[in-house]
Amino acid sequence: MGSCECPALLLLLSLLLLPLGLPVLGAPPRLICDSRVLERYILGAREAENVTMGCAEGCSFSENITVPDTKVNFYTWKRMDVGQQAVEVWQGLALLSEAILRGQALLANSSQPSETLQLHVDKAVSSLRSLTSLLRALGAQKEATSLPEATSAAPLRTFTVDTLCKLFRIYSNFLRGKLTLYTGEACRRGDR
């Protein structure tokens, strides 16, 4: 193998391992800055949302699940420090991951879980793990934890959902909204 093939092989291996949610050591640290990467996750979230839209049986949860509020006040968001944005995204991603895992457990405990629904929930779990790794490589976790207490973001706004469709809608909205806004700004800032 030539020396020029090694970086290409590492990149190919990194892209193959991303869907597994495994931390990829050889991955370029700014992989999430490639809009195609984030778009792939957004398309997966939209697909899951679309599959569950017409779902009546097996899509209701036996309990409410807490999720992050995905509404964005663009005026406020643009005035926020990138560290405050990182806190909001990091906390939202953590809560969303917990919610999807809880939804996965509730679906597994239902009388007859649909294989299609289970597949989309499993993909969402894997995607959120991968996104967490990509954000960590971008420095979001460091940004979020380096803020002094006095300047930290307001407590994360939340609400509850009771169906898989609503959970996937929040998942899709979070990726298209706050996550896309944050990564866009963090990537631009890193390019300067």
Curated annotation (Swiss-Prot):
What protein does this entry describe? Erythropoietin
Q: Where is the signal peptide?
A: 1-26
SUPFAM superfamilies given in the database record? 4-helical cytokines (SSF47266)
State the family it belongs to: Belongs to the EPO/TPO family.
Q: Where in the cell is it found?
A: Secreted
**Entries under InterPro entries matching the protein:** 4_helix_cytokine-like_core (IPR009079), EPO/TPO_CS (IPR019767), EPO_TPO (IPR001323), Erythroptn (IPR003013)
Organ and tissue specificity: Produced by kidney or liver of adult mammals and by liver of fetal or neonatal mammals.
Sample GO molecular function, one term: hormone activity
A Pfam cross-reference name: EPO_TPO
> Which of UniProt's keywords are assigned here?
Disulfide bond, Erythrocyte maturation, Glycoprotein, Hormone, Secreted, Signal
Primary localisation category: secreted
Query: Is Signal one of the keywords?
Result: yes
Sites carrying a glycan are 50, 64, 109
What organism is this sequence from?
Felis catus (Cat)
Question: Function of this protein?
Answer: Hormone involved in the regulation of erythrocyte proliferation and differentiation and the maintenance of a physiological level of circulating erythrocyte mass. Binds to EPOR leading to EPOR dimerization and JAK2 activation thereby activating specific downstream effectors, including STAT1 and STAT3.
A cellular component term from Gene Ontology for this protein is: extracellular space
The record's disulfide annotation reads 33-187, 55-59
**GO BP terms, alphabetized:** erythrocyte differentiation; erythrocyte maturation; erythropoietin-mediated signaling pathway; positive regulation of cell population proliferation; positive regulation of Ras protein signal transduction
**Cited PROSITE patterns:** EPO_TPO
